[in-house]
Every structure is written in structure tokens, then in C-alpha cells.
Swiss-Prot record:
GO terms for cellular component: cytoplasm. It is an enzyme of class 3 (hydrolase). This is dTTP/UTP pyrophosphatase. It is found in: Cytoplasm. Its EC number is 3.6.1.9. It comes from the Bacteria. It holds the Pfam family Maf. Belongs to the Maf family. YhdE subfamily. The active site is at 81 (proton acceptor). HAMAP family: Maf (MF_00528). GO terms for molecular function: dTTP diphosphatase activity; UTP diphosphatase activity. The record marks 11, 82, 164 as: Important for substrate specificity. The lineage of its organism: Bacteria, Pseudomonadati, Pseudomonadota, Betaproteobacteria, Rhodocyclales. Its cofactor is a divalent metal cation.
């Protein structure tokens, strides 16, 4: 049994492969941000937990629309959304290098929460699960931030860092799911898939 992954993220593809799930990718419009038909702008007063659920569910629904428009075989559509919460504020992907550096300076020496919501749309019904992790950074100096931003790694990632990459050097403590911080919590995703008859591994 195969599913569709509604994401451009190479990390999510890698993690699905890791747990033995067969999938095809349904991508969004070329030349635009991933998930371009999904409004990722936080609503006024929207809490981070509600935000990540809304966006993950919307991505799954939009992925299903792509499947229908292309007249592809009907299968479950999996999507995910990752965001950071710092002092109650939603922190998404940086808009440019200056923004990435500013985000990293804020996170330096602090603890933040990483929320990843996973949604699977199947037969008109959406199942959802949330992974919540706390990450503590050591103090990061300006030179380290400059070098890291120049590497380009922060630019497509919520919170301006990838824990599986060079930013692993900044992580002093992690409480939660490493793969959830990467963008797809494999334990929670596996449990969600089992409800639909998939057998990870």
C-alpha cells in the first residue's frame, strides 16, 4: 500500500523511507514556496498548537485536490507542518539571511518548543497527531551565526536551523522527538499510519 506525500521536504522523504513506507510525492506549483496554496500566515491571536494543526490539515486537503485534479489513483495523502514557539510567538522560516541571523540570536542560550503536526487525509477524513519537543541552545556567538547563515542551511527551515545538520552543534539539550524536530516524528507518524492499515518496517 502506497501513499502520497504532500511536501517538497527532502527530510520528510528521507524519514518516510527510513520507516519503510512506499510513497509518491505530490508537489505544489513550481517556482513558488512549498505548499503555495496553503495560507501559512498565522491568524490574529492564533496559538502555535492551533496554527500547526490548521496548516498541516490544510496541506493534506490541498494534496488531495492535486491528486483529484491529476486523476491519480486515490490513496492516503500525508502532510506535515513544523513551527517553533518561543515565548509564545510563532517562528517560521526566515525570509532572508538577516532574518535567519536575527532568529538565531534570539534562540541563543534559550529553550524553545518545536511543534510538528502530521495529517493524513484518507477517504475524505483527516487523522492528525502532534509532536512537541523542547530544544535548548547553548550560547552562540555572532561569528558562528554568520558562518551558519552563509552556509545556506537555515533558509528553508522553521526557526532557521536544521537539527540534523550543522546546527546540531548548537543543541545543548533535547526533550522530545529528534525526528519531530527534523520535520516528521517517525514514532507518531508510524502509529497514525497503522490506524490506516499501513505496516511500517
Amino acid at each position: 500500500m502506497r501513499l502520497y506525500l504532500a511536501s517538497r521536504s527532502p527530510r520528510r522523504r528521507e524519514l518516510l523511507n527510513q520507516i519503510g513506507i512506499d510513497f509518491d510525492t505530490v508537489v505544489f506549483r513550481d517556482g513558488m514556496r512549498a505548499d503555495s496554496e496553503t495560507d501559512e500566515t498565522p491568524l490574529p491571536g492564533e496559538k502555535p498548537v492551533a496554527y500547526v494543526e490548521r496548516v498541516a490539515r490544510a496541506k493534506a486537503i490541498h494534496g488531495l485536490k492535486i491528486v483529484e485534479e491529476r486523476k491519480l489513483p486515490m490513496r492516503p495523502v500525508l502532510s506535515a507542518d513544523t513551527t517553533l514557539e518561543f515565548n509564545g510567538e510563532i517562528i517560521g522560516k526566515p525570509v532572508d539571511r538577516a532574518d535567519a541571523a536575527a532568529i538565531l540570536r534570539r534562540l541563543s542560550g534559550q529553550t524553545h518548543r518545536v511543534l510538528t503536526g502530521v495529517a493524513i487525509n484518507h477517504m475524505g477524513h483527516t487523522e492528525y497527531v502532534l509532536s512537541s519537543s523542547e530544544v535548548t541552545f547553548r550560547e552562540i556567538d555572532d561569528e558562528e551565526i554568520r558562518h551558519y547563515v552563509m552556509s545556506g542551511e537555515p533558509m528553508d527551515k522553521a526557526g532557521a536551523y536544521g537539527i540534523q545538520g550543522r546546527a546540531g552543534l548548537f543543541v545543548k539539550h533535547l526533550a522530545g522527538s529528534f525526528t519531530g524536530v527534523m520535520g516528521l516524528p517517525v514514532c507518531e507518524t508510524g502509529e497514525l499510519l497503522k490506524r490506516l492499515g499501513f505496516r511500517p518496517l
